[in-house]
From Swiss-Prot:
Keywords assigned: Cell cycle, Cell division, Coiled coil, Cytoplasm, Cytoskeleton, Membrane, Protein transport, Transport
Tissue and organ distribution: Expressed throughout the plant, both in mitotically active and quiescent cells. Enriched in dividing tissues.
Family the entry assigns: Belongs to the STXBP/unc-18/SEC1 family.
Protein name: SNARE-interacting protein KEULE
Organism: Arabidopsis thaliana (Mouse-ear cress)
């Protein structure tokens, strides 16, 4: 299998971000490479399977594909019209079913297409290659037969998923066999390895160690997930080193493998950034938001599907901002636009009163200059207004304050009982998420009748309580606590009377309700400094002594960035969300505004993979730390879950049997 030579790793060459490399490989290395000889000026058919069509859609637009000479996109398993004068590009998984369909298309006297350029998404077996070579009628019609080694969804400029939506159930559930769990991990390992094959990176592989791995202790399959995944990835990388031309032979980056047990609170706590709140509160389908546009003629309002994604500059600027900050910036943008328009100024003077954001929105829409740019601005003003209404209607400020106080040890059981007894307007989901956080910090409070009493007080169903009880399957903060100094686990603050599972980071409290931070933030910073304890996070390979030399760049960057962030306060900022003080220049989102910073001076990449689903707050952390550490931090996971999705998945879990070391196969 051939593989083109492109220097995209962080150890040399022009630096491009993760999604950019993915996109360029698909468009140029695959689609454009099929433009050979006499076929240069002709249109082609692109044939994909259910997985590869998603890979393509996450990385490229249809216009990009068309520009590379593709006039038609087809599903390999659907009946297709013969186009014998056209060439076909196959981007498919290397499965027996796909190969059979390909041979059916191209064999015999009347093939569907003139020539076939075949690109497999991951390594293909010798058996399947042999199966293709056996058909003598097909061989002359093959223009290329290659491994792209690209089998992941690039969901963000610094994020990918392996499309294992049921990983939590398959790996943490009781009903699933260890064989099914192993199969899931094997595919996962192969797909993660294609990330490194694509970027031409060879990582130092570190992973969360099993909590008790000795001859006298029983351990569970779920506790060995990072260990087994690390071994699987390592095996795949060893093959890539031998088969891929110019693949690095020494470490060029770092990979840290974790699972959802590392932080059970991040998936359910209310996150207050614009991006997270949109996906949490607006019932969006993926990144699609249904925008209702009032009719200018007084008729029925128009419904329009819009995508909230990186191509939208306003979304890109605001997605990691606190909702109060985002609302304020949108108001400022609208005001600035109107200040440049004389007709709008006259209208404002006639009314005499201060204009609300909604008034500004209506005025802008009535202006003759109303354009696509203002349409985008109006869209985000509407979204922010809707979010702020929901925050008020659902009493999320009070709930959010209690959640964060619980996490930081400033509140306890009495405060939760008081809240459940007095806040009758609180939503069912809000109370459920509160109890899930409580169960992580105080698991003993849900034993026996105690759990039943809390369920009655919160007026939750037994189905809801299944999610609460299943938090224990991910390991509670209490169970995870280790006595070793510098350990990775959730630690208690001895200075507080109540139990705390996060240490205060004063620089993080730029806005109220933004104290919480995901555990991976602390882990990534320790990894970058070389301070992760080896007993908790062993390494599959011992990197060369010079490997950590690149981290000196990150420490220099840290010292040069220690400037206080500018306060965004004004008379319009709600009192509940006002900034609480200065920070280190990274906190609120001053760094995130410049997330598309110059990558050319970046150090070695850091990859973090979380089995069991990642959160938007964790993705935000990776953007933030990339600028702080001067190293591109890429988050991978089995899926990207918003709180409702995570709760649904958690309800599917049941207790798992213990696994003896004799049964362990790594």
């Amino acid at each position: 299998m051939s593989y083109s030579d492109s220097d995209s790793s962080s150890h040399g060459g022009e630096y491009k971000n993760f999604r950019q490399i993915t996109r360029e490989r698909l468009l140029y290395e695959m689609l454009r490479s099929a433009k050979t000889g006499s076929s240069k000026s002709t249109w082609k058919v692109l044939i994909m399977d259910k997985l590869t069509v998603k890979i393509m859609s996450y990385a490229c637009k249809m216009a990009d594909i068309t520009q590379e000479g593709v006039s038609l996109v087809e599903d390999i398993f659907r009946r297709r019209q013969p186009l014998p004068s056209m060439d076909a590009i196959y981007f498919i998984q290397p499965t027996k079913e796909n190969v059979i369909m390909f041979l059916s298309d191209m064999s015999g006297k009347s093939p569907l297409y003139k020539k076939a350029f075949v690109f497999f998404s991951s390594p293909v077996s010798k058996e399947l290659v042999g199966h293709i070579k056996k058909d003598s009628s097909v061989l002359p019609r093959i223009g290329a037969l290659r491994e792209m080694n690209l089998e992941f969804f690039a969901i963000d400029s610094q994020g990918f998923i392996t499309d294992h939506e049921r990983a939590l159930e398959d790996l943490f559930g009781d009903e699933e066999t260890s064989r099914k769990g192993d199969a899931c991990l094997n595919v996962m390992a192969s797909r993660i390895a294609t990330v490194f094959a694509s970027l031409r990176e060879f990582p130092a592989v570190r992973y969360r160690a099993a909590k008790s791995l000795d001859a006298s202790t029983m351990t569970t399959l779920r506790d060995l997930i990072p260990t087994k995944l690390a071994a699987g990835i390592w095996n795949c990388l060893a093959k890539h080193k031998q088969s891929i031309e110019n693949f690095p032979q020494t470490e060029t980056c770092e990979l840290l493998i974790l699972d959802r047990s590392i932080d059970q609170i991040a998936p359910v706590i209310h996150e207050w950034t614009y991006d997270a709140m949109c996906h949490d509160l607006l019932n969006m389908e993926g990144n699609k938001y249904v925008h209702v546009i009032p009719s200018k003629s007084g008729g029925q309002p128009e419904k329009k599907d819009v995508l909230l994604e990186e191509h939208d500059p306003i979304w890109l600027e605001l997605r990691h901002a606190h909702i109060a900050d985002a609302s304020e910036r949108l108001h400022d943008k609208m005001t600035n636009f109107l200040s440049k328009n004389k007709a709008a100024q006259l209208q404002g003077k006639r009314d005499g009163a201060e204009l609300s954001t909604r008034d500004l929105q209506k005025m802008v829409q009535a202006l003759p200059q109303y354009s696509e740019q203002i349409d985008k601005l109006s869209l985000h003003v509407e979204i922010a207004r809707k979010l702020n209404d929901l925050i008020r209607e659902q009493g999320l400020r009070e709930l959010g304050q209690l959640e964060q106080d619980l996490v930081f040890g400033d509140a306890g059981m009495k405060d939760v009982i008081k809240y459940l007894s007095t806040q009758e307007e609180a939503s069912r989901e809000g109370k459920l998420r509160l109890l899930m956080i409580l169960a992580t910090i105080y698991p003993e409070k849900f034993e026996g009748e105690k759990g039943q009493n809390l369920m009655k007080l919160a007026k939750l169903s037994s189905d809801d309580m299944t999610a609460v009880n299943n938090m224990s399957l991910l390991g509670s903060a209490v169970d995870a606590k280790k006595n070793t100094p510098g350990g990775f686990t959730l630690k208690f603050d001895l200075h507080k009377k109540k139990r705390a599972v996060r240490k205060e980071r004063q620089e993080e409290a730029a806005w109220q309700l933004s104290r919480f931070y995901p555990m991976i933030e602390e882990l990534i910073e320790k990894l970058s400094k070389g301070e992760l304890p080896k007993e908790d996070f062993p390494c599959m390979n011992d990197p060369s002594p010079s490997f950590h030399g690149s981290t000196s760049l990150s420490s220099a960057a840290s010292s040069s960035q220690g400037q206080a962030a500018q306060s965004m306060r004004s008379r319009r900022t709600p009192t509940w969300a006002k900034p609480r003080g200065s920070d280190d220049g990274y906190s609120s989102d001053s760094v995130l505004r410049h997330a598309s910073s110059d990558f050319r001076k970046m150090g070695q990449r850091i990859f973090v993979f979380i089995v069991g689903g990642a959160t938007r707050s964790e993705l935000k952390v990776c953007h933030k730390l990339s600028t702080k550490l001067k190293r591109e931090v890429i988050l991978g996971s089995t899926s990207l879950d918003d709180p409702p999705q995570f709760i649904t998945k958690l309800k599917l879990l049941t207790a798992n049997d213990d696994l003896s070391l004799d049964d362990l196969q790594i």
